[in-house]
């Protein structure tokens, strides 16, 4: 599981960085991920706040983001002593496995669509912004990028299909490894 755990850590950091635009929240997300994973038990947000040493609002934001990524599990329980509902958060190996399967599946779908597009229609690409255009779109824009007016370049699909085929094979192998539980 260890090599995949590092991939998940990097993904969590980048996703939080993109979503919230704050490097500190990215580091907090990794700290929360590591804490929940290493402890192997469900913890309330208050307990996590005291462990990681950040304010409760940021910890709750990160926990909610991890939950939205389908990486963290939450259980709600009524605490009679406090008189309120408390949420206990956890990250289990099965959560990580499910997360990886969903993520790899999404990437495989995108690679498949791109390979299909490359085999069915000529593709032109802008060398500056790397946006792809079909033959019809390139013709409509007079073979110039509509964003920066750079001349579009025709790409040889055989070169890209070879690379994408290798990427697809590697992803399928990774998916098989994760699905079998031999991660």
Curated annotation (Swiss-Prot):
Belongs to the TFE family. The keyword Cell inner membrane does not apply. Monomer. Interaction with RNA polymerase subunits RpoF and RpoE is necessary for Tfe stimulatory transcription activity. Able to interact with Tbp and RNA polymerase in the absence of DNA promoter. Interacts both with the preinitiation and elongation complexes. Disulfide bonds: none annotated. Pfam families: TFIIE_alpha. GO terms for biological process: regulation of DNA-templated transcription; transcription initiation at RNA polymerase II promoter. SMART domains: TFIIE (SM00531). GO terms for molecular function: DNA binding. Keywords: DNA-binding, Transcription, Transcription regulation. PROSITE patterns: HTH_TFE_IIE (PS51344). SUPFAM superfamilies: Winged helix' DNA-binding domain. Residues 4-97 form the HTH TFE/IIEalpha-type domain. The winged helix domain is involved in binding to DNA in the preinitiation complex. This is Transcription factor E. Transcription factor that plays a role in the activation of archaeal genes transcribed by RNA polymerase. Facilitates transcription initiation by enhancing TATA-box recognition by TATA-box-binding protein (Tbp), and transcription factor B (Tfb) and RNA polymerase recruitment. Not absolutely required for transcription in vitro, but particularly important in cases where Tbp or Tfb function is not optimal. It dynamically alters the nucleic acid-binding properties of RNA polymerases by stabilizing the initiation complex and destabilizing elongation complexes.
